[in-house]
Amino acid sequence: MNPFNHNYFLGYINEVTPQFVKVHFPSSNLLEKFSHKGVFYAGGNVGNFVVIEGEEFGFLARLIELELPDGERKTISEKAIQHDETAFHPSGKAELLLSFSVFEPEKTQKTVSKYPAIGAKVYSCSDEQIEIYVKEFGKKQDEAENVYADLGKLTSNDANCKVSLNSVFGRHCAIVGTTGGGKSWTVAKLVDEVVSKTNNKVILIDATGEYSKLTSNSLTLGTDAYFPYQNLSIPDLFYLLRPTGQSQRPVLLESIRSLKVVRIAKAENSELAINTKQKAEKEKLKFYTFYQNHIRDIEDNTCNFDITFLIEQIKEECVYPSGYTNNLQDPKKWGGYDAKTYDYQTSLVGRIADLINTEIFNKLLGFKGAPAGCSSIVEGINKFITQNDEQILRISFENIPSSFSVKEITANALASFLLNLARHNTFRTNPLILFVDEAHQFLNKNIKDEFFESQTLDAFDLIAKECRKYGMFLCLATQMPRDIPIGTLSQMGTFIVHRLINELDKKSIESAASSANRAALSFLPILGEGEALLVGVDFPMPLLVKINEPDKKPESNTPKLKAKQAIPITNKISDIKK
């Protein structure tokens, strides 16, 4: 590959700054498109790539501005442009993107401290050369690790954009853009590429059901699947019950411990095996001895107990800390019933009763046993991970209402379950990619108790911060990047940015994606449907890409308004006669 052929010549560098260079074009004819030896070159129009020749390093740049000198603007005409090659001398501004070795043009690096000299020659860049550079982004030394996805074509010159899947997902990925910009197609395309190019598995959280045609291996929460409450973590249960910190939370925790003791005792046929653990006027020794012997199972941070007895157990926990023996205070046994402590629990008891008896929560969490016709989503995920016949699992939230924060809490519980699997190295040898569509519905959500103390649902945030090294990669798709927690957004190594209009959204991307400079972000409001700006840690320069159609398209088409049908005159006359 020889990028510095005189047949590709465009002009000379006449000004150099840390951000851009200015180019002098000896003739306006040099800006036109041309072909050489069957290879198409885009010339020197705005948005096109050019290469700049240096002594040791060459430079790839993108033209972002063209203009004529003031003295030549008044004489411009169609005839003068076409027939007088020396009448016009345009100048342009080009953004420096990356540098490469003159002796090994395939090896690229980011432009930091190297700049072209005044008088350096500028050449048009071929599609082939751009394809080679893009393919080098994120390339690993081990060839077996280099898995490439046919993501789309560059908008400037239709060069194929084959990017490394390890570069896209290795440090998590975010797909952002306003509605109708093409996010759903991009998600579907990435899923297609992962499934067709690798043996890795994909879990897709589908908020609206638009990906139903992507795979037949689907679980719809609230319809044919439920999340067993026994797999909730204690914090997840607290999100649902919202206990107050000082008066209700300690009693609730003790109630949960007691019910876990009851469950384990039943399994061992112990004398403690009753439905609720009675404490009033009872000896403490047997309980604490049993507790110490099974402390690992009891303090496992799960809700593996019979929640239908929780209200009764809360009342049993409302006792004085010490009892009496022969009219003397005895710390070895609990005291009698404490009505004042129980009064503080009445609002909590009411919330528990509402939770257990609410139909939607029973369908989702199975408080009264597995709902009819529903399978456990935990068993479904475990089966999906351990068996090799399926690569995609779609988990649909389309039938879950937004009331009571049930959608956010259930998604957070599901993310906590996957986070726990990742922490146990389930995905280290065979990484899993977790796609979250409409991520703004699940992330950056807070739950408030009756005293308006806020608790953050942070499972997805923890996945973004922890799970890269465990082999679980997160891919978020959202309309509003400003609604994603800044801690989560800053962990994203790759951004695929569709059309963005809101200034706050653009600033959130600019602050999170270091390589997305102002010149690249200026294209965001005018991007067409399916066009996106690809930026990331492993991409030395931003890429404007037209995403290819996915094999299985999501149901994201906008319903069309239809023209009103004219009423036939004969029908009008018959109506008058009636």
Where do the protein language model's features map onto the residues?
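Basic- and hydrophobic-enriched, low-structure N-terminal and domain-boundary segments
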Residues: 1-176, 190, 428-430, 445-448, ...
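Glycine-rich phosphate-binding loop of nucleotide-binding enzymes
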Residues: 146-227, 486, 508-509, 534, ...
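Loop/turn-to-beta-strand initiation segments
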Residues: 199-203, 389-392, 429-433, 470-475
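Helical "lid/switch" subdomain of P-loop NTPase nucleotide-binding domains
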Residues: 207, 211, 233, 432, ...
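P-loop NTPase motor domains
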Residues: 213-215, 229-234, 239-459
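Conserved ATP-driven motor cores of ASCE-family P-loop NTPases powering translocation/secretion/packaging/pilus
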Residues: 238-244, 456-457, 461-546
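Conserved AAA+ ATPase small/helical "lid" subdomain
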Residues: 252-274, 523-552
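Conserved P-loop NTPase motor module
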Residues: 302, 313, 320-322, 529-578
